[in-house]
């Protein structure tokens, strides 16, 4: 049996059963390359909608579980330290999620991505449901909720590295920012779906808020196992009417045929080591940038419904259900922000410029939302939407296009076996910030919400500053066409450079 440090694949890829079934009814016997791309795009898109939807019930039921409700809350969260305990639950989930991300990324480059992803989805569905089961089982042990969240975080961590790796196997760098900008809408749509499902079911008891997303996750996990093609060689896909063994171009150098490199050798390139992945140009600054970006975005993810329900808007307090529904406006802004950030970064050939610019604009957006959001519902909606655009936009850009770019960086010489590892490093580091933000908010909000927003604005500022070196390199490239400098310092080769045509 291969050891943990083994750099070879530990599995044999097979064509999914669902695709074999579809091919029996197709006249040509095979799906086209574009049909496979569409299938991968849709399946990975809805899969991560489900992942995000499964995270949302925690924020929706916070007000119900805490002592501020008429019913008196739910022990052990109904005491004066209830918000702090809820923050600790969030910390447990996100801490394990962050650590698990690094491990999942390491394994994702070595295991069958389809099976590994399915395990993550079904496991997530199971433990999301178990949190809600406490409602009917009348569980009140803090350690029960803690243990369930720890396991949920562990299985959730499997999703992202696997999904980005699969998507990267099917789409090259050309227009990747725009494509992944659209695809990254899954984050916001998942939050919206989770909010609407959890809020809609809350009236029947808070346990139902967890069961709805749990069933969705489990069902889609089965669909993914049956239909998701991990990479072109697995399904013998042909690209744009050409044979799969057409040569692949790395810069100006023609290397071995695609068939030889991916089929004859069993797709058997060595996986990039964890420390080696950190040394890929651009990985470290974007990883630490995402630390602060996710600190801001996940604070909103976990606390925005609670904040809305506990602060007067237009002279009145909103119900828990209404607050949960209203909070989806932040994610609607995130959909626009993700697409906009991807498009701008493609046009400028500058991922760092775009990400930092959005985070700098998030600072006044946060300030205005805190100061003027209470005046009326209309103003609150406008400012919440604006905040979502500038906060989720760079979050989506870094976790998708940037991660895929760096996972196929030219320094890897065409080896796409770093995709899951690089994605895990970047999103895993960001998830540490995501764990810290909500738990700090649980304590700081008990003192002052103003202090919470000052913390978020400071994090947004630091996030932008961390990309300063990359921004300088990208600006020089824009002004003087210094591609070599960007290649050495920035996140990815500029879009004007010939794309690495290796079906990554």
UniProtKB/Swiss-Prot annotation:
* Tissue specificity annotation: Expressed in the root-hair differentiation zone.
Name the GO cellular-component terms.
Answer: membrane
A GO term, aspect molecular function:
transmembrane transporter activity
Protein's cellular compartments: Membrane
Q: Name one GO biological process term.
A: phosphate ion homeostasis
Chief place where the protein resides: membrane
User: Coiled coil located at which positions?
Assistant: none
The membrane topology noted for this protein in its Swiss-Prot or TrEMBL record is: Multi-pass membrane protein
Task: Give the keywords, sorted.
Answer: Membrane, Sugar transport, Transmembrane, Transmembrane helix, Transport
Against InterPro entries, the record matches this protein to: MFS, MFS_dom, MFS_trans_sf, Sugar_P_transporter
This one is known as Putative glycerol-3-phosphate transporter 2
Q: Which organism is it from?
A: Arabidopsis thaliana (Mouse-ear cress)
């Amino acid at each position: 049996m291969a050891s943990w440090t083994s750099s070879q694949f530990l599995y044999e890829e097979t064509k999914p059963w669902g695709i074999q079934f579809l091919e029996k009814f197709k006249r040509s016997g095979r799906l086209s390359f574009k049909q496979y791309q569409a299938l991968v795009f849709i399946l990975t898109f809805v899969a991560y909608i489900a992942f995000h939807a499964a995270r949302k019930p925690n924020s929706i039921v916070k007000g119900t579980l805490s002592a501020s409700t008429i019913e008196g809350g739910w022990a052990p969260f109904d005491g004066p330290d209830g918000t702090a305990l809820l923050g600790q639950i969030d910390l447990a989930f996100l801490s394990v999620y962050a650590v698990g991300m690094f491990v999942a990324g390491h394994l994702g480059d070595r295991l069958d991505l389809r099976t590994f992803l399915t395990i993550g989805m079904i496991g997530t569905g199971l433990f999301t449901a178990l949190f809600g089961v406490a409602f009917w089982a009348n569980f009140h042990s803090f350690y029960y909720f803690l243990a369930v969240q720890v396991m949920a975080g562990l299985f959730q961590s499997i999703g992202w590295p696997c999904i980005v790796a699969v998507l990267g196997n099917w789409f090259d760098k050309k227009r990747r920012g725009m494509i992944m900008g659209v695809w990254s809408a899954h984050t916001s749509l998942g939050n919206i779906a989770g909010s609407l499902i959890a809020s809609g079911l809350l009236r029947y008891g808070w346990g139902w808020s967890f069961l709805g997303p749990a069933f969705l996750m489990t069902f889609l996990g089965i669909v993914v196992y049956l239909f998701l093609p991990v990479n072109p060689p697995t399904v013998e896909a042909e690209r744009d009417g050409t044979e799969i063994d057409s040569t692949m171009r790395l810069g100006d150098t023609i290397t071995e045929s695609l068939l030889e490199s991916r089929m004859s050798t069993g797709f058997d390139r060595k996986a990039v080591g964890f420390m080696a992945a950190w040394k890929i140009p651009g990985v470290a600054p974007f990883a630490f940038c995402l630390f602060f970006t996710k600190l801001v975005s996940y604070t909103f993810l976990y606390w925005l419904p609670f904040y809305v329900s506990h602060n007067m808007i237009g002279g009145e307090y909103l119900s828990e259900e209404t607050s949960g529904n209203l909070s989806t406006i932040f994610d609607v802004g995130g959909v626009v922000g993700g697409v906009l950030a991807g498009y701008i970064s493609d046009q400028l050939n500058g991922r760092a410029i775009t990400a930092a610019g959005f985070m700098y604009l998030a600072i006044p957006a946060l300030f205005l939302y805190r100061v003027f959001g209470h005046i009326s519902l209309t103003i609150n909606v406008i400012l919440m939407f604006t905040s979502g655009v500038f906060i989720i936009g760079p979050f989506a850009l870094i976790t998708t296009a940037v991660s895929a770019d760096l996972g196929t960086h030219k320094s890897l010489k065409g080896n796409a076996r770093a995709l899951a590892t690089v994605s895990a490093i970047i999103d895993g580091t960001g998830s540490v910030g995501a764990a810290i933000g909500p738990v700090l908010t649980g304590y700081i909000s008990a003192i002052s919400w103003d202090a919470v927003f000052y913390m978020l604005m400071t994090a947004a500022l630091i996030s932008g500053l961390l990309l300063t070196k990359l921004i300088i390199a990208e600006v020089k490239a824009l002004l003087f066409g210094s591609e070599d400098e960007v290649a050495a310092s920035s996140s990815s080769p500029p879009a004007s450079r010939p794309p690495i045509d290796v079906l990554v």
